[in-house]
Amino acid sequence: MIAIKKALYMTVPLLTVITSCVQANDNASSGSFTIGLGGRYAPRYSGSDKQVWQVVPVLQGRNGAFFIDSQKGVGYDLQNTSGWYFEHTLGYDLGRKDKNASWRAGANNLKGMGDIDVSLNTALAVGWQALSWLSVEGKATLPLTDSQGVSYQASFTLIPVQTDQDTIAFQTAALFGDNRYLNTWYGVNPEQSRRSGYSRYSAPGGFYGIDNSLIWSHQFDAHWGTVLSADYTWLGEHANESPIVLRRNEAALTAAVTWTFWSESMACVLPGKVKIE
């Protein structure tokens, strides 16, 4: 499912780094707290042909290796001197309604499909910051409640512009999921088919899409900042062949204003991991 929460999940890891400007000092811990508010114009659900405006809260805190984030959840990350890093998070997924919803994915044309419940998950990511402006990462997200399957992504991030005031970042990710995951979000079982009128569809596991994000962050001073992002998602055949997918090419826009409370002087770096020997 690449809509609202899922698309935000692509954007927020970059937004987290850009807005909190985590210090990368081998001899000192880092910490900051950022709040903000924004808006997002995105598909009602992955594959929807209708868009919706949503309010996007921003809440991000960091103390050394540990962090909390309104989109990612809570977790920690570590990086060695070679640039390899590891991240572990405990997060959530808002699921999907079978009617129009203002704070989660859902649309009236899904009536009869039933709701996909809110669930807890854990995510494991391993990546390499090859250069100050280039990083690659592999990530797996596993459900802890309401078995909805496992999703994976392989991504790389480029940062062509990075100054004291402005950061521009581009991220592209290939998206994968197991059979259970794809059928949770794109499949139509016999009971759903009977209730909704959609034809049956059993989605095979594997590659199901590509997500691209372009993000511009501007810092007015030590506290006030803005973040603008544009996202484009293309759904592969495993998702696009589902009868509930009405549009395979999706776009989303996000804008947010942030306020950062600094606990110490920091400099913006990516990916913002705490280094270990």
Question: Where in the sequence are the language-model features?
Answer:
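C-terminal/domain-terminus segments
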Residues: G225-A256, K273-I276
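Structural signature of outer-membrane beta-barrel channels/translocons
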Residues: R62-G64, D77-Q79, G127-Q129, T157-V161, ...
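Short glycine/proline- and aromatic-enriched beta-strand/turn motifs that initiate or cap beta-hairpins
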Residues: N25-Y76
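Outer-membrane pore/translocation modules
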Residues: A28, S70-Q171, N179-P204, A239, ...
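Transmembrane beta-barrel architecture of outer-membrane proteins
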Residues: Y41, L120, V150, Y208-I210, ...
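Transmembrane beta-strands of outer-membrane beta-barrel proteins
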Residues: G31-L37, P57, F66-I68, F86-H88, ...
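Cleavable N-terminal export/targeting peptides
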Residues: M1-S30, S48, W262-E277
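Outer-membrane beta-barrel "beta-signal"
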Residues: V56-V58, F156, R248-E277
